[in-house]
Amino acid sequence: MKVVVYSHDADVRAQVRLAIGRRPAMDVPEAEIIEVATQPALFRLLDAGGADVMVLDGEAQPYGGMGVCRQAKDEIYNCPPALLIVGRADDGWLATWSRADAVISHPIDPVALAHELAGLMRERPAVGS
């Protein structure tokens, strides 16, 4: 299953990759992680239908994951579900505005990320399935 990870920060992308591992739970397919650092790269991938699930860093620069999530939900047909990583727990209401399907906060809790991502992976068949 293709999991796209969006953040300008290579350390955040590495933390997400480590939290996901080969698969975030035993009952979901293996994750093929695709890292992107820019909003244009993310939208090229989404336009091509190359993602099953998105993990978006709300603190990404210059395009934050919240705005990117909302834009994707508005513009991409059959947009993949999105897990949004917000700057603090109190920003959960912004995740609602952005139409994220799941939310966790920084600092990244690997167990919480894996749990939320596995839930999204269970809900959506893989591209090409």
Predicted features by range, described:
Residues 118-129:
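The C-terminal output helix
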Residues 28-37:
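Short hydrophobic/Thr-rich beta-strand motif most characteristic of the beta2 strand and flanking loop
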Residues 1-21, 54:
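Conserved acidic segment of CheY-like receiver
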Residues 52, 76-81:
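His-Asp phosphorelay/catalytic-motif detector in bacterial-type signaling
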Residues 108-117:
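C-terminal output helix
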Residues 87-104:
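Alpha4 helix (beta4-alpha4-beta5 surface) of REC/receiver domains from two-component response regulators
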Residues 36-53:
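Acidic, metal-coordinating helix/loop segments flanking the phosphotransfer/catalytic sites
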Residues 52-73:
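Conserved phosphotransfer microenvironments
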